[in-house]
Amino acid sequence: SPLHHDERGYFVENWRKMDLLQYGVPELFFQGKLQNNVSVSKKGTIRGMHCQGWAKLMTVASGTFRMCFIDLRLSSPSYKAVDVIDVVPGMAIFVPAGVSNGAQALTDKGILNYLVTGYYDPNAKHAGIMPLDKTLNLPWDLSGEVIISSKDQKSDSYLSIVKKIESTRKKIAVIGYTGVIGSKVFEQLHSFKQYEVDGFNRDNLSELLQQEYDCVICTAPSSEKFKTNIGLANPVEEIEILVDTIAKVKAMQFVLVSSQTALHSENRYGQVQNEVCQAVLQHHSNHSIYFMDTLYGENLKKGLIHDLLHQ
């Protein structure tokens, strides 16, 4: 917002909802505001790097502040990205929940406003990173006296905070990860940083039982319907191993991508799909099963046409 100067000083519209919405601040933020805080800081003072878990709208009433930000949201495409900006009156900075933030007063008696969605509690224990962390090496102004509270000086290191965050990743296993559907699921899951994804097929399926998973996604057995019906795919031994593994694997949630053929077991392919489906129903109370019709993937790698063309 522009500053309106006169002989008394200046006036500024600190923030306007319609402007902030235009620049990406979510509507929900304005419904959840609980408190406005003001800090007055001596030159050189660093407050941070805080991560209280709530959103903030930060504006400067007087002076200049160097603000540093680290995105600690596992699900964010900018996870672990660092941003630095010198903020003066007339600028508004929206900090999403999960983004660690800190500010250094570059001028004396700097005044900073915080509009927040959480109540202040001096005894609360929130995550924080020591602002002078050597790994981060943030570009604070260290040319003069630097003032940091004892609480902020005792904050965790950047690497220890990252380790804690990444230990919360959900562990997911994809059975059939080299198949047409499985490979796409595996590829997409790998693009999300909040997931730790392992892939299994007939070559390493036994290793699935060595760990516990938050979720197991099964896209097996092979979708080669024609070959299965004439005995050239999905042999009995492989299906027995798959069914046994499904029964024994430890998972909080089990997702099966099956075929509508499982509902009609008059041929071998339907029987195979039904066996796998029954194993899921019997051994995993928290399950989801998706019955899909015959699909044709990239280069016709699925379905009857592919089977006929590649005999």
Where are these regions (language model features)?
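N-terminal Rossmann NAD(P)H-binding glycine-rich loop of SDR-like oxidoreductase domains
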Residues: 170-195
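Non-catalytic, conserved peripheral segments adjacent to functional cores
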Residues: 1-87, 107-109, 116-169
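Short beta-strand His + acidic residue motifs that chelate non-heme Fe in jelly-roll/DSBH
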Residues: 101-106
